[in-house]
C-alpha cells in the first residue's frame, strides 16, 4: 500500500492544473484545521487534506484543535483530491487513524455477540479466478498473484462492473458461520459471506504484503469465482487464524449434530460438506497429484520439526553424492499416502516403490535453502524420526503445497475422529448411568464394555498419527506459507 506522503507526491507531480486558484476548494469559516469544503460533480463534501479523508457531513471541532485554521497546514491547503474519484455514501468511510477509532466503534464492538472478532480493512477489489487455479499446488500462487495485482494497480484502475467495496474502509466481523463487511460509520451491512462457501483464503506472501488478506468464493449472481483482496490495519495472519478457529468450531458442531441424528440418517458426514480450513490452498481434493522429482534419499534426524533440522539434513544429502546419482522419480501425493516410483518403472504396478510414507506420519515439511529442494520429516515411532528430500524443477513450491494440502486433509480427519470418539464416550457414560439407576445393588450385570476405537491404522500407528499431524499443524498455524525461504 502506498504511503500518504508518496500519494501526495504523485498528486503534485501528475496534476497540471492550477492547484492554488481552484474555486471549487473553499476555506469555509468555522471548519477545523486541515478541512476544506469542496464542490464538484459529485456534490458538496468535506476533505481533510493531511490524511486524505473525505465525508459528506460537516466536520466538528474537537478538544485540542487550533483556533486558527491556517496554523501549520497553510502550505498544503490548496491541494485537491485525486482526479476521477467518485464519492458515495459508503465511500465516505475513509481512515481517520490506523485503528478502529470510527464513530461509535467501541459501543458497537461491545454490542456484538460473544466470540465475534473485528478487523479494520480496506477493500482493494476482486479478480476472477479460474477453477483450475484452485487445485492443490496452484491455489497459493493464484491467490498471491491476485493480491499483488490489486495492490499494484488499484490506484490507477477502475473497479470491474458489479464490484462492491473497492477503495472503501470496512469493518470485517467474523462470527459464528459468516464473515460480515460493515460500513464503519453507520454500521450498515455491505456484504455477508458464509464461511462454508469460501473456497480458499490466504495472506500475502511477498515482502511488504503481510497485511493483505484474500479469500476466494463463488459469486451468486455471476456464478464466477472471485478473489476478494483487503488491506488490514493489523497483520493479516490474525484474520487467517480467526477463520481457522471458526471453521474448526463449525466442523466440531457438525460432527456432533451428525452423531445425534445418526439413527435417523444413514449418510455419514462428508469432508465435502465441511468448511475448508485452508491457508492459500484447497485441502479437500481426494485425487492424487503427481510430480517429477529427483529422489535425494533419506536420513535419520534427531527432532520431529524445525527448519534448522530440515536444512541440515538436506545439506547432508546434497553433499553426500553426485547429483547424477539421484533417482528420477514420479512422486504421487494423495490425502493419505506419498509414494515415489522410479520413472522408468512407474508404469509397472508390481514394482516396489522407491520410497513411501503415510501422510499421517508427517511432522514437518519445508523448502530448503535452495528453492529446488523439498524435505519432510516423518515420525517412525519410539522417538525415531526420518527426513526425506527431493530435488524439483523449476522449484519445489508445487510439491510443497500438495503435501501441505494432504496434511490439512489428515487434520480434518483427526478432528472428525476426535469429535466422534468424544460423542461415543459420552453415550457410553450416559448408558452406564441409566444402567446403575435401573439395576439393583446386587445385579449380576457388570459395567458396559467400552468400544474399541478403530481408525485407519491400529496398534502403534494411532499415536504417531495424532502426534504427527497435530504437531505439523501446530507449526503450520504459526508460520507463513511454506513457500517462504528459510
From Swiss-Prot:
It comes from the Eukaryota. Interacts with APP (via intracellular domain). Interacts with APLP1 and APLP2 (via intracellular domain). Residues 113-280, 285-440 form the PID domain. It holds the Pfam family WW. The gene is APBB3. This is Amyloid-beta A4 precursor protein-binding family B member 3. Residues 29-61 form the WW domain. CDD domains: PTB1_Fe65 (cd01272), PTB2_Fe65 (cd01271), WW (cd00201). Expressed in various tissues, highest expression in brain. SMART domains: PTB (SM00462), WW (SM00456). Its main location: cytoplasm. One of its GO terms (molecular function) is low-density lipoprotein particle receptor binding. May modulate the internalization of amyloid-beta precursor protein. The keyword Cytoplasm applies. It is found in: Cytoplasm; Nucleus. InterPro entries: APBB1/2/3, PH-like_dom_sf, PTB/PI_dom, WW_dom, WW_dom_sf. The keyword Cytoplasm applies. It comes from Homo sapiens. Keywords: Cytoplasm, Nucleus, Repeat. One of its GO terms (cellular component) is intracellular membrane-bounded organelle. GO terms for biological process: positive regulation of protein secretion; regulation of DNA-templated transcription.
